[in-house]
Amino acid sequence: MNRNDLDRRLRELSIYSDFYYRKELKALVQLIGDGEQLNCVLTGVHEGNRKMLAVTDRRLIIIFAAALSAGDIKVIRREAVSEYRFERKLLFSKLSFSTSSGASFEFTNTQGSLKALFEWAMQQPLPEMD
């Protein structure tokens, strides 16, 4: 995927104006594989830092793009997510999910307006593997 393709997909999801300037997108362009479909992007505070969470048809990708130090990327296969919960509040919405291996993730101060998009992205069928 190149940046033009990413920008086009963000527009299709109606979230381009919320994220077009985020420095995490540079890493996301390199991480999304051929044929992989981006379905949701949101940001929130995870482990004390503001991070981006991208949901594709195959994976959840957590990106931390630090200004003065090395960033951090975590990739979770979508089929490994055993449960998720998105608590939408007027302010300070929270997303949490856990994996079948027992790992837990929590994003606070996230965009409550993206709850429906996140849930839609998580409900999309996993692609067939050859």
Cite the ranges covered by each PLM segment.
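Acidic, Ser/Thr- and proline-rich intrinsically disordered linker/docking segments
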Residues: 2-33, 43-48, 66-130
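General secondary-structure edge motif
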Residues: 8, 40, 60-61
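Polybasic phosphoinositide-binding surfaces of eukaryotic membrane-targeting domains
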Residues: 48-63
